């Protein structure tokens, strides 16, 4: 009987917890006009605010984020710092919002600025807003659009109108969430419907969140413009470059900062979108326009794809519709179908990173390569799922959108470019033409971003607010979450991970999940212990470092890291034949595995899913791999990079040769041999050296030991040097100790100044406090 009562009590408690979830509904009507001579917006906003909470509300926090650009005292200005372009700008380049006059249900209300932030205001309600009640809030507002410093802004007559209107802060089960605008730190807003009318000069091309209402004429005009863009894309690469060069010779008068509007005719575009929590729009007269479609099995009508880009970037953006198509396709396949009617990318002048996402639309900064452009478009389109449809609190839990999106980016690249060995090209000249780093994968690129900082003593966990991170650590929300979730995917398997992530999407679309909600979906779908992921990855700075070595007929797996994650061991026989795969759980110190029959060697995580910070000790066998200059290493193999090398000095003259080295990003040291031929004296000269790097957890802090020998410049020498640094908030200490042994060639030096022979020399002992 007691057990039955406890069970009923548990069910009742769970039921009450489920009922605790609520979210407010906020619907907008905004009429806005753009003045492109003064770079201002004049607008009127009406908001329908429905209180779905169980609480009575006496006030509402509002964000008026254009005020972030008003002066040097805002949270944004302080975060940007004294060396930022904003700090060096004048008042004419800055922005603000004013002319606010809030009314609730037709009656004026009192409102005050937040005590710390001038871009947050508090509206005092004349009457208590009870659960289930709806009020109507309205206000005029005027925005001076700043120069592009962060997200909202203009460059000449190019406009990026984002975070531009007064919007209520989120009120959820954890209370109010007022927050100032920041560059490092994104957003959290209520879902609802946006009905926005934009009036501006007729010759602007405009794209925004939502669909045009009665927009047949505007859509027909845009579609007509695609014919010219299609004709450009039919040109050869050289012909297109000539056209771009020619188009850039004539400077557009309409884009000069103080130019008058090129037309006195205006148009009003009416956009509407349901189930979103933000609205952004972009306008430019010069954009080229491309259009495409994405068909999904469950949708009767295709999704329209729009790409708007500047003529100077025509060659780079010619495949942008493909990138939009593939992003929408793969994310829909992974999580659930895209629910809106268009996916759009616009070419921008963004200062807040490589791109920025908004519902239905993303703005992209200039990129150096096609792969990077595809990556950024795909990443920002992916935010329609993680931030857009699943509306987590980006400011408080950055990893929930950026990190899960980064994991999805890796998966996209692996699936789309599987036939090309998942190549990721950052610099086309270096990788495609010179053949350097030609086999670099995007998954390795993401791994490296995490691994290089994982053992840093100043590293921060992922459970902090965005503004609490240093600039270096903020990126871990992307890379660390991405690589560990990819590893979790490998551990659980494709089928199970897909089931879980699709369930997460269905359970939380158009809602505001927290980390515990994300974890609960996994608990509901798998009985595997995932504490190492949900606690170890997000709440600690623990890292993975396993090694393996052979002991007769057994293999010893050792944990040198601070995280006890699962670890996969793969055994191989003759001809690299795979014999068996074994997963070990919770290896805290050491574990022995009996060798399978015919197994000759074993490798930890040969497919490189596990974010082990030191992969050099992950195999009992090492092969020799030769690379031209440098390429992505395996770490545990002998990855030898061959680089043409030459030096010149008075005694030897020109000394051509080659550098053979092992090391680089992700290695704990460097080994190098530099054989060269002395053309003056016709003999072999060169250097050989080895560097051991120690991380900041070492006794002497971050340090290195180098040992080398050289025959060059008329000398034979040996050198041992130990140097390092220790850093605290109060003081930084740099130190070095160096011991040389030199043998001087009497024909290379003036004997009146130098004595030939060999001797030991203490070259330096140095210590400095900063």
Regions found by a protein language model. Name each.
Residues 13-42, 155, 531-532, 643-645:
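N-terminal, polar/Ser/Thr-rich
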Residues 25-26, 271, 300-558, 564, ...:
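Hydrophobic alpha-helical and helix-loop surface patches within well-folded domains
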Residues 168-176, 185-378, 407, 419:
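Hydrophobic helix-coil surface modules that form long, contiguous segments used
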